[in-house]
């Protein structure tokens, strides 16, 4: 083999580090039942977005931009207008020449990678390279290894990591070849070091090669990265696991070395001369620069209107306190909440709505009665701290209920074992088939009514040692929530905490419609935990000592907003005192009216125009339980902006359900502590959501989940494959962003507006590496409000927009 690379330090130490460096470029994914939106380019955030796009184009033939025809259509249709193109060219430091830019749109867009691995190289006499065969072998090995639920015939043995499992299964065929046998070491670190010495890649090139190879099974690479990510956060589901992505990379490297070994000397020389130095990126071509100008003009077409609206909004001065509202309702920052908040304020002027991250600052796992696993209900960026365990009020009652549920589950498990057993699979159908007939008919006729998730009372404990929370800890949680949404005074008689969720049937992607801040779960549980804390007398006494006085006349209630039907379910209605019944009854009436207005507003996008209010609600209810419904709602499609500031900035605006809204009062945060939290957590989560939708539209073949109609679930809840494919699909199904004729999401980077002094925002950028990377490398656009002006952060300075 030509030109093996010599590494200066011990390979056993350096190579695994390089392998892990490559794995850091892969974004993680979560299981279907805990699915959350992820920025597919998160691992590349430290590079400028334009350069990363060029690198990905070189590695995969998959840059970030839409094809030229997309921008041409936007120009011809008037969505992009000349002022937008002029501004985009000016930002790029180029002279506006619309005719030249139009001509460059006609240039052919290359989707061919510049680098081709030895596995992807077609040798003389071959019809195709060995890549596809290897891809299928590794993909099926991953499916067998990670399939812990559906594959009930798997023979249990000694615990193996992924590399060892592959070695004992698929690796045996390679082991028969003497030239490769020396590479097959018993552990992945040693194997990676051995293989890397045999490859002609430098220490700079090796991580790029690994990234390229992992991209051929991006779904499984992302899954392995997710397992590593969750294990690092202490997830009990992933305990005892580590470096799965690195193990997968090592398997790929072994196959790459094998492909090189099989080449003739002439073939190796030809391949190396052509591809090994293909990692040196050429400067951006004129066509590429033009395409970025067109994309920026496409963004400016919406952002300019958005910023104009912010500047001209009818807002009161922060120096003028809002009159005390009759009700305060805190919603998740999710873009779908913008619609219900706007409609609720329209029908109920006495209400004040607020926006806050939908897990309500409760970093919890939820433990239900019976033999169930804990459910994480917090953002994927965080590790759970507390467990919320349901209780009937006494340990004896809890144990009795657990025993009953355990018995039921044992019966169900017996049926499942018979159903999946290799001996009884067919006889079970013959003997019990008729017993399932009524359920089949009932479900086919949509007779099951979808209901909001039941939320039972519970107690908070520490995840690690199981001890109850101390009073100061409970006060900390409550204070953190109230300060996060700048609600520290002027409390209304009713404080409603509204989580949100979606209720669908036969939908593996259901978690993608639920609350991302709650780990792909519905938000009612978190709302209930927060409301219980805020109603606790000892917690209120502790808050008062810290300067937050909640009057005795204020009650906190929890609720959940179904984003498909726009109905809001309030929990604990029977606990509302007589003194609050008038306000409560008014609230219930106004919530129903606001939901009705929301349904009318959404009818056009759902193709349900012309229906009466009753028929519209009935149709949306049907969607929650229809087996065949592929578009129960549009989720967060078309998200484009975020506002971190007082509601007065946006209360007079119709933002079309396109903006994340988080309340923030800069006058209550002189230290900038709250702003740091909001820009480093909710803003990053919004970026993850925004760029997942972006990727699912820009490159649905790579960063999307394909056609829902062809999905097959892998491993019970690992993910989905499309048709007979071998790779997990990441991102969003086509039906979530495309209506059959038009894209329902416009691929734009998030435009964030923050109402805070420049020095406070800049301090957050300096102090947080992730925020700095996203802002300075243009993965999002950051603006601030100053009087009646908006200014954009641009290379360390603020530019008037």
UniProtKB/Swiss-Prot annotation:
Presence of the UniProt keyword NAD in the record: no
Location of this chain's protein in the cell: Cell inner membrane
Positions bound to Zn(2+): 332, 334, 500, 515
Cofactor: Zn(2+)
UniProtKB keywords: Cell inner membrane, Cell membrane, Membrane, Metal-binding, Transport, Zinc
Complexes and interactors: Forms a complex with DabB.
Family note: Belongs to the inorganic carbon transporter (TC 9.A.2) DabA family.
The name this protein goes by in its record: Probable inorganic carbon transporter subunit DabA
The species this protein was found in: Marinobacter nauticus (strain ATCC 700491 / DSM 11845 / VT8)
Name of the gene: dabA
